[in-house]
UniProtKB/Swiss-Prot annotation:
Record's subunit section: Homohexameric ring arranged as a trimer of dimers.
Enzyme Commission number(s) from the entry: 2.7.7.56
Role: Phosphorolytic 3'-5' exoribonuclease that plays an important role in tRNA 3'-end maturation. Removes nucleotide residues following the 3'-CCA terminus of tRNAs; can also add nucleotides to the ends of RNA molecules by using nucleoside diphosphates as substrates, but this may not be physiologically important. Probably plays a role in initiation of 16S rRNA degradation (leading to ribosome degradation) during starvation.
Enzyme class: transferase
Full protein name: Ribonuclease PH
Organism: Aliivibrio salmonicida (strain LFI1238)
Gene Ontology molecular function terms on file: 3'-5'-RNA exonuclease activity; tRNA binding; tRNA nucleotidyltransferase activity
CDD domains noted in UniProt: RNase_PH_bact
Length: 238
């Protein structure tokens, strides 16, 4: 039995609130149970120096956590003068996931930066960030189309992510903190809405996992991501 009483394949209650902040071209509060992340997408009419003159745009991301997003306070990374390795890994993952969903040539020489700020963490912050960032990105692109900065939509489709793992000998989907901290195996999966995978990150935290367990986790991830993408579509239709 899972701590929350959920079935193995059941994701947490998901809420996606659009237009959450006033100034960004796209902004979302995404909630996966008690994990809450603000995702804002900002448009700039320039690209990194190495892309200038190439007729392509760029999508990048930054990630951070409020000091008391977790059970005990963490110092702000700015206080130490550098980002931690975990932070850099996660923001690169978010950026790669979003770029896979965008035709960068169709974006033109414009850049979209998506900031993901975790205000409360209960497991799955990177997967919630990707899910919310995709909606914020879609809103920013729609804003660009409406303002004449784009003639066509460069998004190839929705992208979403979910965690899966082996907990008490069973493959489960969308781990909360109590499960994540006690899991034998932890895996994050990022997929497009057509079912193609963007990234699979899996680690045997306690015990190695079998080929069959890998297949079980991937099947749960696909089912969970399908459910999450329906939530994204419903939010964007409002």
């Amino acid at each position: 039995m899972r701590p929350s009483g959920r079935t193995a394949q059941q994701v947490r209650p998901i809420t996606i609130t659009r237009h959450f902040t006033a100034h960004a071209e796209g902004s979302v509060l995404v909630e996966f149970g008690n994990t809450k992340v603000i995702c804002t997408a900002s448009v700039e009419e320039n690209v990194p120096r190495w892309l200038k003159g190439k007729g392509k745009g760029w999508v990048t991301a930054e990630y951070g956590m409020l000091p008391r997003a977790t059970h005990t306070r963490n110092n702000r990374e700015a206080a130490s003068g550098k980002q931690g390795g975990r932070t850099m890994e996660i923001q690169r993952l978010i950026a790669r996931s979003l770029r896979a969903a965008v035709d960068l040539e169709a974006l033109g020489e414009q850049m979209i930066t998506v900031d993901c700020d975790v205000i409360q963490a209960d497991g799955g912050t990177r997967t919630a960030s990707i899910t919310g960032a995709s909606v914020a990105l879609a809103d920013a692109i729609n804003h660009m189309i409406a303002s004449g900065k784009l003639k066509k939509n460069p998004m190839k489709g929705h992208v979403a992510a979910v965690s899966v793992g082996i907990y008490k000998g069973e493959a489960i989907c969308d781990l909360e903190y109590l499960e994540d901290s006690a899991a034998d195996t932890d895996m994050n999966v990022v997929m497009m809405e057509d079912g193609k995978m963007i990234e699979v990150q899996g680690t045997a935290e306690v015990a190695p996992f079998s080929h069959q367990e890998l297949l079980d986790m991937l099947a749960l991830a696909q089912q969970g991501i399908n459910d999450i993408i329906e939530k994204q579509k419903a939010a964007l239709a409002e």
